[in-house]
Curated annotation (Swiss-Prot):
One of its GO terms (cellular component) is cytoplasm. Its main location: cytoplasm. Belongs to the RRF family. Disulfide bonds: none annotated. GO terms for molecular function: ribosomal large subunit binding. This is Ribosome-recycling factor. One of its GO terms (biological process) is translation. It is found in: Cytoplasm. The keyword Nuclease does not apply. Responsible for the release of ribosomes from messenger RNA at the termination of protein biosynthesis. May increase the efficiency of translation by recycling ribosomes from one round of translation to another. The lineage of its organism: Bacteria, Pseudomonadati, Spirochaetota, Spirochaetia, Leptospirales.
Length: 184
């Protein structure tokens, strides 16, 4: 049935949106060390912009410290420079073997700014979920041949319930991240 395919496709797209929310939130600094803070920072490696996570291992030996062990020790200066210019406010130290990054405490003002960023990213993804719902409803309208009004209404209700559940998931992730940011 066409409605099953529409709902299945919609859920797949919404799952990808939830994954993006998690990834976006992972890049927001909270005062705790997390490899996702730096793993996507791009470094010029032999003419290619390569993410740090492809250039070495990123570990968390302490709650507020990241350690990057590059596979190629010759790129350490480039990794260090990329982190410094990333806008995250991190100061890496290079001892010739590994790069250490101590995650500084967040100020109250910075926490408020980050909470706003979280809300903004959350709203963007909620809009994306609603757009996916709209597309699913339009697909349903195109495939209503042979369906009764009750069946159409039932599928529309199902689409709305699924949408609401995904919006709730984003809200829960947002609340969790805001709590993480504002907890001192």
């Amino acid at each position: 049935m066409a409605s099953d395919a529409i709902i299945s496709g919609m859920k797949t797209k919404m799952d990808k949106t939830i994954d993006l929310v998690k990834k976006d939130f992972g890049t927001i600094r909270t005062g705790r060390a997390n490899p996702s803070l730096v793993e996507d920072i791009r470094v010029d490696y032999y003419g290619n912009q390569t993410p740090i996570n492809q250039l070495g291992n990123i570990s968390v030996p302490e709650p507020r410290m990241l350690v990057i062990s590059p596979y190629d020790k010759g790129i350490m200066k480039d990794i260090e420079k990329a982190i410094q210019t990333s806008g995250l406010g991190l100061q890496p130290t290079n001892d010739g073997v590994v790069i250490r990054i101590v995650i500084p405490e967040l100020t109250g003002e910075r926490r408020k700014e980050l909470a706003k960023v979280v809300k903004s990213k959350s709203e963007e993804k909620k809009v994306a979920i609603r757009n996916i719902r709209r597309d699913a409803m339009e697909d349903l309208k195109k495939h209503t041949e042979g369906m009764s009004q009750d069946e159409i209404k039932s599928v529309q209700d199902q689409i709305q319930k699924i949408t609401d559940s995904y919006i709730d998931k984003i809200s829960a992730l947002t609340a969790e991240k805001e709590k993480e940011i504002t907890t001192i």
